[in-house]
Amino acid sequence: MKTVLLPLKIKDTESISWTKGLITYLKRSYGSSQWSVFYDGDKTAEIDSCRTTANSDLAPESLLDQNYKYAAILEQIYLRLGAHSGSLQMDFTWYEAEYHSRLSEKKFKQHTVVFEKSSVMYNIGVLLSQIAKKKMSDNYKSAIPYLSKAMACFDYMSNNFLNSPSIDCAAENTSFLSTLLHAEAQEMFLMTLINGPDASKRASLISKLAHTALNLYEKCQEFYEDSSTATFGTTPYGEDKWKDIITLKVHLYRAISTYNHLRVLEEAKKIGEAIAYGKLAVHEIKEAGFYKVYVKDEIDLTGLKAVIEEKLKSLIKDNDFIYNDLIPADVSIESIKTMDAVKPVTWEEQLKVYLEQVVDLCNGAFKGIVPMEVYENESIYSEEKASLLRKEVEETDTADWEYQSFIEFTDLPKLIKDLESRYVHGGNGSSDDPQYEIMKQKITTWSKVVQDSNFKDVRAQMQNILDKRNEILTILSSVSPDQRENALKIKNSLVQASQSDDKIFASINPCLEEVNLLANHQLLWSIMSKFQIRNDEPSLLDLDDSKNQQILDRLHNIKHNQEILRLLKEERTRNLKDFKESLNNDDITQKLILLTGKPKKEMRVIFEEELTKFKPLSTRIEATIFKQNNLINDIKIKLDEVFKLIGVQDKTPEQENTVKERQTFFDKVEKAFNQFVIFSTDLPKGLNFYDTLLKMTRELSHASTPGQSVNLIDSNTLPPNLPQKSTQSTTLTKSFANLNLCNDVNDSVTQSPANLANTNNTGVNPGPPQLPPKPLSTGISGLVSDQKLQNGPTSFYNNPSVFDENLYSKFSK
C-alpha cells in the first residue's frame, strides 16, 4: 500500500546585511570613537554568509543544516536583546509561500528578530517535510524522525509566535501544519506495519494506529471547515487540492481501522460485530473514492475495496450457515482504542547542538550587545526567589496538613454538633456510653452481612467440598486403563486445589467461634450487652444544671475557634497566591543591566536587599501559622474541660476493666469478620472449580465406555507437576477431611492412583502399584507456579490452563 505527503513550499526572502546593522547599532550605543572595540568584522561576515547560504538553492539536507545554524544565531541575539531587537533597525523582508498565484508578490517587512526567527523556523519545518518525502520513497520508517521534528517545529511556532503578520506564520496555520505533520508521521508508522511481514497478526495494533491517524486528519479537516479566514470558493491555507486529499485520508483510515478491527473480532468469534464493522469499512472506502482525483495513481483504493468486500462477503456466508450471530444495527469506531506512535523531538532539543556550535561566533559578533552576565545574574536572582518560594510553600503545606489532620482526628464539626444537641435543652449524657453505641452499630452491620451470606456455615462448606472430592475420586477409580493418563492429570489438579482449600480454611478456622457468634443474633447481643457501661446513680448534672451551661459555653468557644481556624487557612492560601504572583511579576532586568560588572559578593548583597520586598507577604503567612498553632492548643484544652464536666474521664476501676474487655471482644469480632469477607469471596471460586472438574470427570468416565474415545489432555495446558515424597499410609479421603493435604507446593505429595481412588478408610482395594515420583518443577515455570500459590489461596482457581479448554468438544466427538 502507498500514500502521499502534502507538499509544503519554502518562503523566499530579501537579502540583508548584519554587518551594516551591527555597525549602526554599536555606533549608536557606544559612540563613533568606541564602537569598533565591540565589533568583529570576520564573525559578522560569517553570519551574513550563513543567512545567504540558508536561503540558496542547495539540496534540502544542506539547506536544513544552514537554517538550523542561522536559527541558533538568531536565538543568541534574541537572548541578548529580547523584546528590544528592533533597536538593530534592520529590515527583515519575507515573501509568502506560493501556494496560490496571488501570493507570489505578497511580502511583509519588520524590524524584530522574532519575525526573522519565525520565518526561518517555518522554512526548517518545510525542509524537514521535503526530506521526509524523499526518504519515504525508500523506506516509510526513515521518514518518521523528520516528520516528528517538523511537527514539533510548527507546534513551537503556534504557541510562541501569536501575532505574526505573515499568513504562513500565523498561529492558527502553524497549528494546522503541526497537526498535519503529526498525522503524516503516524501514517508513515502505519504504512510500515501494513506493508511489513505478518500484517494480519498485527490487526489490533493497525486498527489503533489507523484510528489515531483518522482523528488527526479529522482535525485538519475541521480546520478547513471551521476556519474564520476561509472565503467562498477558496481554502484558508495551502493548495486547493489539500482539502480533498485530507478528506480522502479521513475516510481511508476509518476504513482501514474498522477493517482491521473486523479481523480482531473474527479471531474472537464475534462474527456479528465483525460483519457490522465490515459494512462500515465498505461504506468508508466507497466514500474515499469520491476524493481520489489527486491521488488515483498513488493510492490504490480499488484493490483495498475489493479486499474488504471479499472479507465481508465471506463473513456473512459463514454467519448464515454456521454462527447465526446477531448483527448489531449500528457500531461506532469510537469503541476502537487509539495509539499515538509519534514521539516529537522538541524544538529546544533540535537546536541544542547548534546553539553550542555558534557560541564562539556569537560571543565575538555580539559582544557589544547586552552581555550574558545580565542573564547569569538574573538566573541567580531567580533561583533565590525560587528558594524563598519553596520555603513558604513547604511551611504552608505543613500548616494545612496539621489543620486537616486535627479536624479529621477529632471529627470536630460532628463532635460539637452532637454535644450541643445533647445539652442545649438542659439534658445530660452522664449515663450514655458513646463508644458502646459505635461498636454496636458496626457489629450490627457485620452480623447482618454474615447472616445473609450463603457461606456462614463454614463446616458445611468444608463437608460440601469433601463430598465433591469424593465423588470425583469415585468416578476416576472406574475409568478404563487407556484413560489413566487423563485421570492422573485431573487428580493432579485436584491435589493442587486441595492445597488452595487448605489455605482458605486455615485463615477462617481460628475465627469460627466469632463467625458463628455473628451468625447467631440472640447469642451475640446477650454477650455484647454485658459490656455496656451503665450509671444507675443520680447524675450530678441533674443536681447542678449550671454544668450544662458551662459545657455549652465551652462548646461555643470551641466552635468559634474552629471557624477562625478555617478562615486562617483560607487567608493563608490567598497570601501564598499573592506571594507567587509577586515573585512572578518581579523584574529587575533593567537594574541588572545598570549593575553590569559588579563583583559577585556585591551582587549577593543586592539580591538580599531585593528579596526584602517580599517580607510583608511572608510575615502574613507566618502569622496565620502561629495563630493556628495557638488556636489548636486552646481547642484541645477546652475539649479536655468539656470531657471532664460530662464525666467521660470519671470511670471506676470496674468500668475500666469492662472497657478493656469490650475492646478485646470487639477486636476479635472485627478480625473474624474481615477473615469471613475474604473467605466468602474466595470460596465460590473453589466451588466453581470443583463443579467444572466434576463435569470433566463425568465426561471422561463417559468417554471410557465402549465406542467412545478421547484425546489425551495436553500436558502443556496443566500447571507444573507437584513434587513427591515417600508414600503415606493415610488415604486421601482422610487428608481431605482434615483439610491438610499440604501447606506448600514444595512439600506436596502426589498420591498413587490406588490411594486417590479409595473413598473410605477400609483399605479393602489395594489397587495397582504406585507410580514413580515425578521430578520437581524447575526453571521459570516452576517458580511461577510456586509464587502463584503463595500470593493468594485462590490463585490456582484463576489459572485458565489447569486443564484443556477443548476437552469438552473432544469428548463429544
Swiss-Prot record:
Residues 704-729, 752-781 are annotated as: Disordered. It holds the Pfam family BRO1. Residues 704-719 have a biased composition (Polar residues). It comes from the Eukaryota. InterPro entries: ALIX_V_dom, BRO1_dom, BRO1_sf. Residues 4-403 form the BRO1 domain. CDD domains: BRO1_ScBro1_like, V_ScBro1_like. Keywords: Coiled coil, Cytoplasm, Endosome, Protein transport, Transport. It is found in: Cytoplasm; Endosome. Its main location: cytoplasm. Belongs to the BRO1 family. Involved in concentration and sorting of cargo proteins of the multivesicular body (MVB) for incorporation into intralumenal vesicles. PANTHER family: PCD6 INTERACTING PROTEIN-RELATED (PTHR23030), TYROSINE-PROTEIN PHOSPHATASE NON-RECEPTOR TYPE 23 (PTHR23030:SF30). This is Vacuolar protein-sorting protein BRO1. It comes from Kluyveromyces lactis (strain ATCC 8585 / CBS 2359 / DSM 70799 / NBRC 1267 / NRRL Y-1140 / WM37) (Yeast).
